[in-house]
Amino acid sequence: MTKQKGTILKLKNNLAIIMTSDCKIVSIKRQPGMYEGLEISFNKNEIINKKNKLAFYSRIAAGIAAIFIIMVISFNLFNNNDVYAYVAIDSDASIEFELDKNNKIVKVNYYNDNTNTVLDELDLKNKPVDFAIKEVIKKLDLNESVILISACLKEQNTKKSSASDNYESEKLSKLIDICKNAVEVNVSENVESKVVEVSYDYKKLAEKNKLSLGRSIVYEKAKEQGIALNIEDIKNKSIGETLQKVKIDDVGVVHNVKKEEPKKPMPEKPEPGKPEPQKPEPGKPDPAKPEPGKPGPEKPEPEKPEPAKPEPAKPEPQPQINDLPKDKTIPEEKTIPNSGVEPMAEPIVEPKDKQQEKPRPDSKLKLEEKPTVEPKDSLEEKPVTKPKDDKKEKAKNSIEKMP
């Protein structure tokens, strides 16, 4: 192997940085006795390449990451199969589900031999809990029975840091909502059931007494309330019968579940001004519905609209002097004794179109241009009398008074 010569420029950690005779900078592993400025000879295989070093470390990092991913996946699979919560269904029979974090069934526990034989054929493992509740109600014909569903989290899940408490409570609330909806949809309208969320302590008591979670709650409450019910009574009686004697409303959080009745259509309100239709009395025929074979009541004829009232006739305008025929003479004006006051002529109302066309007459000539016209009858009956001379009358009276 050919050797190269170079001078040590710098010593850094376990490396010696060398400048070769052809002015290249390379690194080799540091050896004892090396110092800066020393001329040495070295082989090409002693040169440490940075790219090769980076690729080596990259391979190591990728291997570690792959191992970590495999560990996480296997850990999640193991945890998903681990029991996270318990849900018990108690009615005439009792059955309990062990659930994982996804609310899927890991294991089914039976507390009645008859229930075991009936439900074994369902194969509820790995099924969602709402599907399992629906199938149990349908298979055991519990839609007319009172159902008690109890739920709790496993103890190891409740002993966590305060930061995860909200997450656990949300998971339990979601599980309770799933159970409530499953019961409400699949039971009858007249049956009221209960969904209860309790602590893990009741699950411990249930395992001790070999009862389901729901029946263990009823048994403990019966002892607190002084009700004479032993474990055999709790096991054999239906849950609806025991709940009539034992009150469990103060245990954990209790949700009363009842199917909503279908809403009846609201009666139509009559329009304002229209009379409400009269309901026929019981036993009497409805007048609106004619009997078969008989003609129905005659329909009233529609009211005819009233004819429009004629408008009152407008008074005809009085004829003017200029409009009179030529063969008729204008009667003379009545002369009134001189009393020092000029008589006022009555105003004559003309149509609007003529008032606009005619110019306004002079006020001084008003009496002469527009004298009053009387009817022909009155002119013939009342002749015009000339006024007497006042001076002649006075002279006549003075002659008559003389002796």
Curated annotation (Swiss-Prot):
What PROSITE patterns does its record include? RSGI_N (PS51849)
What are the annotated GO cellular component locations?
Answer: plasma membrane
Any Pfam family matching the protein: RsgI_N
* Residues in RsgI N-terminal anti-sigma domain copies: 4-51
Bias-annotated ranges (Basic and acidic residues): 254-314, 324-335, 349-403
Q: Which residues does the annotated region (Disordered) include?
A: 254-403
Q: Which residues lie on this side of the membrane: Extracellular?
A: 81-403
Annotated membrane topology: Single-pass membrane protein
Q: Which residues cross the membrane?
A: 60-80
List all topological domains (Cytoplasmic).
1-59
Cellular localization per UniProt: Cell membrane
Query: Is Glycoprotein included in the keywords of this UniProt record?
Result: no
Q: Which InterPro entries does the annotation name?
A: Anti-sigma_RsgI_N, RsgI_M
Alphabetized UniProt keyword annotations: Cell membrane, Membrane, Transmembrane, Transmembrane helix
| Function of the protein | Anti-sigma factor for SigI8. Negatively regulates SigI8 activity through direct interaction.
Q: How does it assemble?
A: Interacts (via RsgI N-terminal anti-sigma domain) with SigI8.
Q: What is this protein called?
A: Anti-sigma-I factor RsgI8
Species source reads Acetivibrio thermocellus (strain ATCC 27405 / DSM 1237 / JCM 9322 / NBRC 103400 / NCIMB 10682 / NRRL B-4536 / VPI 7372)
Q: What is the lineage of its organism?
A: Bacteria, Bacillati, Bacillota, Clostridia, Eubacteriales
